[in-house]
Design a protein with these regions (language model features):
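Intrinsically disordered, low-complexity terminal/linker regions enriched in Pro/Ser/Gly
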Residues: 160-211
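An ectodomain-focused feature that recognizes extracytoplasmic/extracellular
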Residues: 1-104, 189-209
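Residues in flexible loops and secondary-structure boundaries
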Residues: 124, 156, 160-162
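Short beta-strand-to-coil "C-cap" segments at the C-terminal boundary of structured domains/repeats
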Residues: 23, 151-158
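Acidic, glycine-rich flexible loop segments
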Residues: 83-153
């Protein structure tokens, strides 16, 4: 892996992980029964689900604790292919919902371009990420280059569902062309949400590409 920040080569990238996150809730207008007024509330299910790519880099820099590059962008489900291997050579879309940052409290990474390369295995893929950012500490303020290139771990498709059987229809709705037979389902821990939110226990479901 090669990470360049401000023309420096950083050799302390401890981990680089790419995930496909399915958000299974979204705020939507609802009409209250008691007063008939319309408001918004979180709604759950296929119609309220969206897929996102998320790339995270974990870096250990002695004097730069806030350096934790993170990229988050929506997926165009209508063009998502049947097999992940077909994504090789794809440039991930950038929209007004895309978020790319230098770190938790750091500047935005602008002019972001993230491309997927070859899949080395079902759990590893080559990526190339270029961007630029504003150096808040330079005087006068400068725009500096950022780039990352190398193999990253693919952690799978992750979603939170209220019932185990919800995972398949949600995935089919969000990524309709994806061949789900190439994946195996791994269930995570249950979270008891309690009576205050009046919701069923939530299960974290992860689908990993089978070898």
């Amino acid at each position: 892996m090669t990470l360049r920040i401000d023309n420096r080569i950083i050799e302390t990238v401890e981990e680089a992980t790419l995930s496909l996150i399915i958000e299974t809730e979204d705020r939507a207008p609802v009409t209250r029964v008691l007063n008939g007024k319309q408001t918004s509330a979180k709604q759950y299910g296929p119609d309220y689900s969206t897929a996102y790519w998320n790339l995270k880099l974990i870096i250990d820099l002695e004097n730069d604790d806030e350096c934790a590059p993170n990229f988050w962008t929506p997926v165009d489900g209508a063009t998502f292919p049947a097999q992940l291997s077909q994504l090789s050579g794809t440039r991930l879309i950038v929209t007004d919902q895309t978020e790319a940052t230098y770190g938790t409290h750091g500047p935005a990474l602008d002019e972001t371009v993230l491309e997927l390369g070859d899949w080395l295995s079902p759990e590893a893929v080559l990526v190339r990420w270029t961007a630029e950012y504003e150096d808040w500490y330079s005087k006068p303020t400068q725009r500096l280059p950022f780039s990352f290139e190398g193999a990253v771990i693919f952690s799978g498709i992750e979603m939170r569902v209220k019932r185990e059987e919800d995972a398949t229809p949600i995935l089919s709705h969000v990524l309709p062309m994806l061949d789900q037979s190439a994946f195996v389902m791994s269930l995570g821990r249950q979270i008891e949400l309690g009576p205050l939110v009046q919701a069923e226990p939530t299960t974290l479901a992860r689908s990993l590409l089978a070898t």
